[in-house]
Amino acid sequence: MARGIQGVMMRGFGARDHQATVVSTEAITPNLLRLRMVSPTLFEDAVAEPTSWLRFWFPDPAGSKTEFQRAYTMSEMSPETGEFAIDVVLHEPAGPASRWARSAKPGDAIAVMTLGSAGFSVPEDPPAGYLLIGDAAATPAINGIIGVVPHDIPIEVYLEEHDENDRLIPIAEHPRMRVHWVVREDATSLAGAIEARDWSNWYCWVTPEAGSLKHLRTRLRDEFGFPKAELHPQAYWTEGRAMGTKRGDDDKTPEVNPAPRADKPEAPAPAAAGRGNWRAQAAGRLLAPLKTTLIISGVLQAIITLVQLAPFVLLVELARLLLSGASSDRLWTLGVVAISLLGTGSFLAAALTLWLHLVDARFARDLRTGLLTKMSRLPLGWFTARGSGSIKQLVQDDTLSLHYLITHAIPDAVAAVIAPVAVLVYLFVVDWRLALVMFVPVLIYLVLMTVMTIQSGPKIAQSQRWAERMSAEAGAYLEGQPVVRVFGGAAASSFRRRLDEYIGFLVAWQKPFTGKKSMMDLVTRPGTFLWLIVAVGTPMITSGAMDPVDILPFLLLGTTFGVRLLGIAYGLGGIRGGMLAARRIQTTLDETELVIREQTGKRDGEPAVVFDNVTFGYRPDIPVLHDISLQLTPGTVTALVGPSGSGKSTLAALLARFHDVDAGAIRLGGRDIRTLTADELYRQVGFVLQDTQLVGGTVAENIALADPDASIERIQDAARDAQIHDRIMRLPNGYDTPLGAASSLSGGEKQRLTIARAILADTPVLILDEATAFADPESEYLVQQALNRLTRDRTVLVIAHRLHTITHADQIVVLEGGRIVETGTHERLLDAAGRYRQLWETGQRPALATAAGPTGEAVR
């Protein structure tokens, strides 16, 4: 069958035919047909991810040997069985795809390719929301995206209605999704229907008819400010060209009054807002002060590159003069000029590098200062949501990546472009025929690179996800070595299995490219260019078609042509890495800071702590705490209990102002905590977390974090009260022993060290995340003694994980689903036979099971 130049090119890029056989057909709507197919080899190349699409070769309805290529997104896929489905819009008049689909029956076969398809995946740093725009043809891809978007991220779907049956197409479910149907009156209808609001940091998937796409791109870019990185446009079809045939006037889309879907009521519209900052443009904002400097450095590098090439040109002219018998004075003059230019080029290159290093040093100083200042104003919740590794990467590694971008990447990239272009121009002037030969290795390299890039397709994104996943798992595996070694191979074998899967993925991806990579390396070597120059230049010289001296510039400059071209990739790679680092840094600088509000008045006579109708959510419009009202009387212990995910830790974190509430207020001694500075707040509120943290420094410095000026006597008294003094004295240097990540203290000892820190801080209000949860029995007793001393005469809010530790609390608050469901003492709540009693009885069952004897009966 004839596929024309398009088919030849696709085969050249490594695409291969797979035969797909129709299994069944199903009419989703009167004008949308689902074809279920099976192919035993398709998923050797295809990726089973949302939005993955296939290239079908449909026969010509006229009966010729020509085949027509059409692309369809898979609406169903099963790599294990090789089964998949596509949804075909049945156009009238029918083109090749529509006509074939209408007549398709089980057993019919068709050729399929997978070249160029890329799947969709939710990024690790999710966008503010997803704006999905299309029509009936785009619904398989849109449904695929909806199916993997987390339920706490909003989705806005705009679908263009070309036929009254379009609204019958099933749309995937999502709790935060709104679907808008827009009747097509002309190509501007869909663009005009997009809500005027702040779309900052939304991901936009645009796949409508080609005419609509043109107007959509204009409005999304110009009015809403969508950057290219967040705008993913592609025309799925063109009106008037019904799958390759001319559409007549009779099949004009009928107008239908828009109506909301019966099975999918729309949620309230979000409030309009002004245009905000886009994360995709963050790098540009960070580097804006350096824009002029970087442009100047690029221009200077271009000049320096030409100056550095000039001596080689003069060397060729020197050889030409020498062979022609020129006078020694002329030769000396030319030689001195060449040496002078060589020295000048080296001096200018060194001066440019020195200048850029000075610029980078000042920029890095200001950047680190601004970054650390910003971090001091961020809520503590920002830090708890990130590991120390990511913060280290931000402050240290990313700023180092900017060093290469500022000082080296631009000059390297400019030199890599200017040098080969200048060399090529000069060689064409010398002899255009031999210069033309220099393109042969370059073209081979570019073709091979293009083929590899196209064949890699979705595997590039997969490799990035694999690398991120393996980096995280390797870190967790190394950190958990003590546990892994004690408890054996389960964790180790799991990590090794995942590592083997990763290696298998890389081998399967790269093995077919072995020959291509070897060829790419070969064609860019200086020896390859030298062989070409000699092989072509020698016959030209012997035949008199070329002056012998003219081959010298090719031997001096042409042999390095391939190496110079490779410098472009290295320079662009450095720019790409630096821009990603700049984006991460600027995104951090754009984070919302804690704002100190003006004090509007103090409510005298209030309890120590008051939660007044507090509502809070980690993402907008998704509250995890609902209208929490709670009072903590001075000198009492209040325990928060509830199942996992009920909001205990979140509620306690709000008192420490890890985050600001969305609604309501938290008052401390009658003052809204948002009117307190960090120093004022943490002089009154202390906390002991279950996940203890030690900082680099001595034992004494760790205890004295809250009061760096504390005397050694006060530090030791706090340690005695925390039952840790004797253990400290057994350390090599006592209180002067350095501690840190490699500390030899046990978990219980670290907990007692943090309790000593809280005792020394002596705050009237204490937040306690049940610190004995992971302590051994002996250490638990010492920790409990330390806690008894710590909680004396304080207002305590304790997050209880084991109910038997809080039976004597003055007040027990039961949370479920972010709401308070019960409040009272242990005895009253047990008598009430409510949720607390259920939790209590559930907590007793493991204890009986643990105490079971050999026969399985409980030991009394």
From Swiss-Prot:
SMART domains, A to Z: AAA
One GO molecular-function entry: ATP binding
EC code: 7.2.2.-
Binding positions (FAD): 70-73, 87-91, 97-98, 238-240
Cofactor(s) the protein needs: FAD
Membrane topology: Multi-pass membrane protein
GO-annotated cellular components: plasma membrane
CDD domains named among the record's database cross-references: siderophore_interacting (cd06193)
Keywords: ATP-binding, Cell inner membrane, Cell membrane, FAD, Flavoprotein, Membrane, Nucleotide-binding, Translocase, Transmembrane, Transmembrane helix, Transport
UniProt record similarity statement: Belongs to the ABC transporter superfamily. Siderophore-Fe(3+) uptake transporter (SIUT) (TC 3.A.1.21) family.
Function statement: Part of the ABC transporter complex IrtAB involved in the import of iron-bound mycobactin (Fe-MBT) and carboxymycobactin (Fe-cMBT). Has a preference for Fe-MBT over Fe-cMBT. Mycobactins are then reduced by the siderophore interaction domain to facilitate iron release in the bacterial cell. Transmembrane domains (TMD) form a pore in the membrane and the ATP-binding domain (NBD) is responsible for energy generation.
Protein name (record): Mycobactin import ATP-binding/permease protein IrtA
Organism: Mycolicibacterium smegmatis (strain ATCC 700084 / mc(2)155) (Mycobacterium smegmatis)
Recorded name of the encoding gene: irtA
